[in-house]
């Protein structure tokens, strides 16, 4: 195991354990009901998720780009083989990416596409679009934005209506951003 992989594993374990400790059965029941049982829930509050990610970033200061996207992927996945993905872990992945959006690159669009496809909840899709993808695209240079536009064009033609909607929203954001950059 490399140093980055060990750090990511320890950070994921820290976040998972903390979220479980912060959970409450009544919130877990409410989330399960709201999401139709598609995702498991620990019952952690949104504030607890944000605080846990903040604490993890303080504890594991050396997370670079690769470590950040590896940790987000670890949190997004199933906590154990055969288990259902957990809403709060996925929300923690979104909060992590929000916190480190400046590290993201156009090449991360494929991973984020996977997150959008498997989100199973608007409570995850909306912040992924507004707080991760839109600022990431806005921070790209011209060449990287052109490459990202190719990916968005593919999303626009995808049969998944969620990806089509994401492409439309993000392309509109990019058009507005590019128009404002050209205006003196």
Predicted feature descriptions by range:
Residues 1-184:
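Surface-facing alpha-helical segments and adjacent helix-coil boundary elements at the starts of domains
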């Amino acid at each position: 195991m490399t140093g980055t992989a060990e750090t990511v594993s320890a950070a994921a374990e820290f976040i998972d354990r903390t979220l479980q400790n912060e959970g409450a059965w009544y919130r877990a029941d409410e989330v399960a009901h709201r999401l139709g049982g598609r995702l498991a829930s620990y019952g952690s509050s949104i504030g607890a998720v944000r605080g846990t990610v903040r604490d993890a970033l303080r504890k594991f200061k050396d997370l670079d780009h690769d470590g950040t996207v590896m940790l987000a992927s670890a949190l997004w996945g199933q906590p154990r083989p055969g288990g259902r993905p957990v809403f709060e872990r996925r929300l923690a992945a979104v909060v992590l990416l929000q916190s480190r959006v400046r590290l993201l690159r156009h090449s991360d669009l494929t991973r984020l596409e996977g997150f959008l496809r498997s989100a199973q909840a608007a409570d995850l899709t909306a912040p992924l679009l507004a707080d991760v993808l839109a600022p990431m695209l806005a921070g790209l240079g011209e060449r990287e934005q052109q490459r990202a536009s190719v990916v968005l064009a593919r999303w626009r033609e995808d049969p998944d209506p969620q990806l089509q909607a994401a492409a439309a929203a993000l392309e509109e954001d990019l058009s507005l951003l590019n128009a404002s950059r050209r205006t003196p």
